From Swiss-Prot:
Its main location: nucleus. It comes from the Eukaryota. Keywords: Chromosome, Developmental protein, Differentiation, DNA condensation, DNA-binding, Nucleosome core, Nucleus, Spermatogenesis. Testis. It comes from Dasyurus viverrinus. It is found in: Nucleus; Chromosome. The gene is PRM1. One of its GO terms (molecular function) is DNA binding. This is Sperm protamine P1. Residues 1-62 are annotated as: Disordered. InterPro entries: Protamine_P1. Protamines substitute for histones in the chromatin of sperm during the haploid phase of spermatogenesis. They compact sperm DNA into a highly condensed, stable and inactive complex. GO terms for biological process: chromosome condensation; sperm DNA condensation.
């Protein structure tokens, strides 16, 4: 019985690590929301800047 409990604990720890990774993904989602707000501004300033410059900057940020 004790050995079985140890295995269940290791499994719960691995699940906790996966949840932590999901939390880090949530932080990335927040930055993605911010980039979306900026993208709206970029649409308004399309004439002033070239598309290539913006695409390169976006790739550098990610």
């Amino acid at each position: 019985m004790a050995r079985y409990r140890r295995h269940s604990r290791s499994r719960s720890r691995s699940r906790y690590r996966r949840r932590r990774r999901r939390r880090s993904r949530g932080r990335r989602r927040r930055t993605y929301r911010r980039s979306r707000r900026h993208s709206r501004r970029r649409r308004g300033r399309r004439r002033g800047y070239s598309r290539r410059r913006y695409s390169r900057r976006g790739r550098r940020r990610y």
